[in-house]
Each structure stands twice: as C-alpha cells, then as structure tokens.
C-alpha cells in the first residue's frame, strides 16, 4: 500500500515522502496515529498545500523532544522485582512498567517509545533502554532491576553521590578554565 508520511519516521522516511508499506501496518498503526495518509491524488495536493504547516509542527515537536531529552539525560530507573536465588526474575520487565515509573517522576512518555534493543529483561542487573522522543531524538536511560527495596535505596544513594561528584568535578574544571583564561 502506498502512503504519504505526515511526519519523519526513522524506519520509513521523511515528511511528505510516498512510501510503500504493508496494509496492516498502515491501517493499524500509521493511520490511527495520524502519521500517514493513503497516497491518492487528492491527498498529494492537500499535502503540498499543508507541507509548510506540517514542517513547522514537526519542528515544534522536535524542540519539545530535545527539551525532554535534556531532562532525561543521565536518567536511571530502579525496578524492584521478585527473583530466584540465581537472579532470574519472575516474569519480565515491560515498557509499561518503565513508562509508569517515569510518569511518577514527572516525565510523560508513551510506553511505545521505549525500546529494549531486541532483548527481554528477565534477570536482575543493569540494562540500557532507548527512549525515542522523536524520529531524530533518541535518549538512552539506564534501568536497574534489583531484588529488594534495600538494594534499590543503596543503589539510588550511590548513583546520586556519583552524579554529585561528577557535577562538582565539572564545576571545578569550569572554574579552573575561567581562572586560566583570566591570567592570560
């Protein structure tokens, strides 16, 4: 089925391009999300008329995504899951769980924009999850899956201390560079 993209989609193409996709993908995902329309002569002429407006809208979404990406930079999420003695969790971690935790922390992210990179999280440990905020903005966040609340609290304290020390080092480096610049 030929469709016209109404926004940039990393795996398909750019705004305004006519691409061929499977009918089910178009009907069940692209059309309901208003990411594409069927490629007809009418829609092609409408799109040409609306192209400028759509491009402005896309730029606004990109700017919002970049702002959200800054707030998610160096973000980590700690999940507490029941697990066996060998570290295998009962069930698996889902994108909905991660999105729910991020929402509790004030970040509104659709679970469909989270990607585990082709793996399923079924063991305790540290994992990278990509958050696709826009077709051009993908932010990695770290997921820690732990067994108990005690482990989670210890991990949070260690991570926060590391972030504070990194921030202090960056400030010291900036102050040192500023002082070196004043001497010349």
Curated annotation (Swiss-Prot):
GO terms for biological process: translation. The keyword Transferase does not apply. Residues 173-184 have a biased composition (Basic and acidic residues). It comes from Wolbachia sp. subsp. Drosophila simulans (strain wRi). The keyword Ribonucleoprotein applies. Signal peptide: none annotated. Belongs to the bacterial ribosomal protein bL9 family. PROSITE patterns: RIBOSOMAL_L9. This is Large ribosomal subunit protein bL9. NCBIfam families: L9 (TIGR00158). Keywords: Ribonucleoprotein, Ribosomal protein, RNA-binding, rRNA-binding. It comes from the Bacteria. It holds the Pfam family Ribosomal_L9_N. Residues 160-184 are annotated as: Disordered. Binds to the 23S rRNA. GO terms for cellular component: ribonucleoprotein complex; ribosome. GO terms for molecular function: rRNA binding; structural constituent of ribosome.
């Amino acid at each position: 089925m030929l469709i016209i993209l109404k926004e940039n989609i990393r795996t398909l193409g750019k705004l305004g391009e006519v691409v061929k996709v499977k009918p089910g993908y178009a009907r069940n995902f692209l059309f309901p999300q208003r990411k594409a329309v069927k490629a007809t002569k009418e829609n092609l002429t409408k799109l040409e008329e609306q192209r400028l407006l759509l491009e402005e809208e896309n730029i606004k979404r990109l700017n919002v995504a970049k702002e959200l990406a800054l707030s998610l930079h160096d973000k980590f999420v700690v999940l507490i899951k029941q697990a066996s003695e060998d570290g295998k969790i009962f069930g698996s971690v889902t994108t909905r769980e991660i999105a729910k935790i991020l929402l509790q922390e004030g970040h509104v992210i659709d679970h469909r924009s989270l990607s585990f990179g082709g793996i399923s999280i079924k063991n305790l440990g540290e994992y990278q999850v990509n958050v696709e905020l826009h077709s051009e903005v993908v932010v990695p966040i770290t997921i820690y899956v732990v067994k108990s609340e005690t482990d989670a609290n210890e991990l949070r304290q260690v991570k926060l201390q590391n972030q504070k020390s990194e921030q202090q080092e960056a400030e010291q480096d900036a102050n040192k560079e500023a002082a070196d610049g004043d001497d010349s």
